A protein has these predicted regions:
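Conserved internal helical-beta-strand scaffold that buttresses enzyme catalytic cores
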Residues: 1-183
Length: 183
């Protein structure tokens, strides 16, 4: 519908403007931008909305650093001031578990309310600098949550793994994680 198209366009514009702001304000700082891949935000938005309409209660996201800040800001609604303070060297989010870590390793969670009024818990897991190390961790987190909820069909808690580069087939951990999907 036209309203859906406008909504997706606004999500795309938010993602693009955020990247341009970070690029202008923090020249030369590592930020692992989403530039060229901004469509990830409307894609994730559509996935969450569609999943919720089919009974999904929780989405657990795992991704390397490329685009994490944008996902944190626009999918998990991590406040801009928290993200920007991490650029200024204040990476403490008040929980005391992030001292010395870098902004593009941080995780976050958020209770999202869909356009239809359904609540979906979103979480982005912490990820170290080892690109796809988080992938099997996400599979384990989701498997445990599904077992706890007795979600035998695997429809209430859904893993989303975002691979942001071309070395997909060259990383053994990716193939091993795909094998886990059949457990």
């Amino acid at each position: 519908s036209e309203d859906e198209m406008r909504h997706l366009l606004s999500r795309l514009v938010e993602a693009e403007e955020f990247e341009q702001f970070l690029h202008t304000r923090y020249i030369g700082q590592k930020r692992f931008s989403l530039e060229g891949g901004e469509s990830l935000i409307p894609l994730l938005d559509t996935l969450v909305e569609s999943g919720a309409s089919q009974g999904v209660d929780e989405v657990v996201i795992g991704m390397a650093h490329r685009g994490r800040l944008n996902v944190l800001a626009h999918m998990l609604h991590k406040p801009y001031e928290h993200i920007l303070s991490e650029f200024e060297g204040a990476a403490d989010d008040g929980r005391g578990d992030t001292e010395g870590d870098v902004k593009y390793h941080m995780g976050y969670s958020y209770d999202h309310v869909t356009e239809a009024g359904r609540k979906v818990h979103l979480s982005l897991s912490y990820n170290p600098s080892h690109l796809e190390l988080v992938d099997p961790v996400i599979e384990g987190i989701v498997y445990a949550k599904q077992a706890y909820l007795r979600d035998d069909e695997g429809t209430r808690v859904v893993p989303v793994l975002v691979h942001g580069e071309a070395a997909f087939t060259g990383q053994g951990i990716v193939a091993e994680t795909l094998n886990l999907s059949e457990l």
